[in-house]
């Protein structure tokens, strides 16, 4: 459907399981809706039992249709092209931003405006993933740019997701034109330069920009890795370190050159280990276990030592959680005494 030079695309079906998605090639991932990838990584998190992914995707389809109609009707560009630096594409993005905010409640969640990254914060799935925005609850810089990209791509816009320091923004990225789009603010729309994000929200060094893969347009596999990191953040907040570590490792597998993900794995393993130690009895029997013959993670991306530590912690957690494990644990402690 062509409407005012807009190519309207509706969502494609997708394997709505992130474990299926991590096995896909880059080319295969590029065929999936970014919204579906994001929601697949949200599925199964605390607070998502009522999440209807297909309903969310249909809502985004309907929003895109309304934006296409509004863009066709709008005469702002003809009346004042200088306001948009003579760029019809910048005008189209402005219209999309306005319709999302005014018509569909696209906004930053008030409770998250004063987020302090130096303090422990409890993140909910609805805040870090796009279903919270679709449901009208608001979002943050972890969800607003993703939804913006998802709707824009339905309109045929060449939008990319970009990472800054603890922040995401959007980029119009085509061979003919390139500009940034800041959508996670309360006053509407801005298009800052890359240099702006080198000093905001926090200054970044050239080494951080390189090692953390910042300010580059993300490929589909990097997008998926980002969503798995957000998944890990939610599991971390509810102290399910087993799930958090698993999501972090798969994020690092998808994006091995991003040293930030790798740097987060060992602290999370330490938190998991310390958490289990609190639950253990004072007298601890020796635990022996055999490693499975087949590796859980790609051997060229995750060391055998890390995988062994994960399996060991998982065994201990299983013994502590299962009634039969607790009974066996207590029996062995009595034998040691």
Sequence positions of predicted segments:
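A structural boundary/capping signal
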Residues: 1-337
């Amino acid at each position: 459907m062509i409407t005012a030079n807009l190519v309207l695309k509706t969502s494609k079906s997708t394997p709505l399981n992130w474990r299926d998605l991590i096995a896909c090639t880059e080319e295969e991932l590029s065929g999936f809706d970014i919204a579906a990838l994001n929601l697949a990584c949200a599925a199964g998190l605390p607070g998502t039992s009522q999440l209807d992914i297909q309903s969310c995707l249909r809502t985004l389809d309907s929003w895109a249709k309304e934006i296409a109609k509004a863009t066709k009707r709008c005469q702002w560009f003809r009346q004042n092209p200088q306001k948009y630096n003579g760029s019809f594409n910048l005008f189209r993005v402005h219209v999309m931003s306005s319709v999302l905010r005014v018509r569909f409640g696209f906004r930053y969640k008030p409770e998250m405006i004063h987020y302090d990254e130096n303090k422990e914060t409890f993140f909910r799935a609805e805040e870090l993933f796009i279903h919270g925005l679709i449901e009208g609850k608001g979002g943050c810089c972890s969800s607003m740019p993703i939804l913006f990209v998802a709707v824009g791509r339905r309109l045929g816009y060449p939008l990319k997701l970009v990472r800054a320091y603890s922040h995401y923004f959007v980029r119009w990225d085509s061979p003919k034109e390139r500009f940034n789009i800041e959508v996670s603010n309360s006053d509407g729309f801005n298009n800052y330069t890359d240099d702006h994000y080198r000093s905001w929200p926090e200054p970044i060094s050239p080494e951080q920009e390189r090692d953390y893969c910042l300010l580059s347009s993300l490929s589909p596999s990097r997008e998926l890795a980002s969503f798995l990191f957000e998944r890990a953040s939610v599991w971390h907040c509810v102290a399910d370190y087993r799930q958090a570590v698993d999501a972090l490792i798969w994020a690092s597998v998808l994006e091995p050159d991003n040293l930030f993900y790798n740097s987060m794995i060992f602290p999370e393993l330490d938190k998991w280990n310390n958490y289990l130690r609190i639950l253990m009895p004072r007298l601890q029997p020796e635990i022996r276990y055999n490693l499975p013959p087949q590796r859980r993670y790609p051997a060229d991306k995750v060391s055998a030592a890390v995988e062994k530590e994960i399996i060991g912690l998982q065994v201990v957690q299983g013994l502590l959680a299962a009634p039969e494990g607790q009974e066996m644990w207590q029996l062995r402690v009595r034998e040691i005494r």
